[in-house]
Amino acid sequence: MNQNQSFLAKMANGSLVLQILVGIIAGIIVATLSESAAQSVAFLGQLFVGALKAIAPILVFILVAASIANQKKNAKTNMRPIVILYLFGTFAAAVTAVLMSFAFPTTLALTLDAAQASPPEGIGEVIHTLLFKLVDNPVNALMTGNYIGILAWGVGLGLALHHATDSTKQVFADVSHGVSQMVRFIIRLAPIGIFGLVSSTFASTGFSAIAGYMHLLLVLLGAMAIMALIINPAIVYFKIRRNPYPLVFTCIRESGVTAFFTRSSAANIPVNMALCEKLKLHEDTYSVSIPLGATINMGGAAITITILTLAAANTMGVQVDILTAILLSVVAGISACGASGVAGGSLLLIPLACSLFGISNDIAMQVVAVGFIIGVIQDSAETGLNSSTDVIFTAAACEAAERKENAGA
């Protein structure tokens, strides 16, 4: 009994990153040795992702409502600079993708089988979807994981309770801490969950289907790597005026790795919240900025939309001038911000961008099909970049505001 308790204590107090690394290696080994065994442990990954997705909506709703209700008068949340960073970062990602596409032109061997899906017809439809998600029924928003609606109702309830009695505010604060404790427990199960995810992914997909699109994949991953390791650190340095890499690597290690394997920004919200708490950021700020970032901070999506659209243009022999490429960057940036409002995310927004070049919907949907083929890596890298950047920009804005206050004191 004592040995079992000792093992559980080591699991609870050990390095989560090292445990995740062990889970990844074990998953690859199991998938290599036995495909059937790997498929049989797939449920561990599904359980982990399911638990994260289940707790995330209530976590966001309670944290946002509690933080706004308990916010001190005249308290600064630094939301404006964070939103500016989110939007600028997304546009910078689209520009990076354009430059990578010009430097390494990509063409696609398009097939006749296009993915069966209904892409949005235009930016107006994306905005329409987002606006109606804003006024969604709060119960339905919690059930379906509509974070735009959850944010709206959480902010509304928080503002309504801002003038409530202290005892009412304390109840919400206590519930918030209780939900946070549940999140910490779920996150400690990450090594087991990622073991299941890696095992099933390698066993079912492997890399045979991806090999034919290696050039496209390298351009996509190269653009995301430049964004993560050069552009984002440069933006952070501009804000905090010190070496940005310790912060950047911490966020990639503790947020990006988990997001890479869960492939869900929504599922990674609890992980990001816990990381923000570990970094000692203001709860009033990160309780709003993290779920908001999961909705509008879509640098990875902007890269995917831009590179696949330009690959389609190259394949069809369309000449793309620099002004059209800049326009594509703007459209990709705006579309990416609405990716969470579209079923299928960034891939189904490709036809919208392709329409800029007069590329037919049939061809555009074949490009989407290519996206689904490489999605096992593309979607993972995209989510890892998107989710880790949420914490990076939130931390940078908080530190910049703190430095400014200290300088003025």
UniProtKB/Swiss-Prot annotation:
Physiological role: Involved in the import of serine and threonine into the cell, with the concomitant import of sodium (symport system).
Subcellular location(s) per record: Cell inner membrane
Catalytic activity: L-serine(in) + Na(+)(in) = L-serine(out) + Na(+)(out); L-threonine(in) + Na(+)(in) = L-threonine(out) + Na(+)(out)
Gene transcribed to yield this protein: sstT
GO cellular component: plasma membrane
Topology in membrane: Multi-pass membrane protein
Transmembrane among keywords: yes
Main localization, broad class: membrane
UniProt GO BP: serine transport; threonine transport
Disulfide bonds: none
Transmembrane segments: 14-34, 48-68, 82-102, 141-161, 192-212, 216-236, 290-310, 322-342, 357-377
Family, per entry: Belongs to the dicarboxylate/amino acid:cation symporter (DAACS) (TC 2.A.23) family.
Protein's name according to its UniProt entry: Serine/threonine transporter SstT
Family annotation (NCBIfam families): PRK13628.1 (NF010151)
A Pfam family it matches: SDF
UniProt keyword annotations, A-Z: Amino-acid transport, Cell inner membrane, Cell membrane, Membrane, Symport, Transmembrane, Transmembrane helix, Transport
A GO molecular-function descriptor: neutral L-amino acid:sodium symporter activity
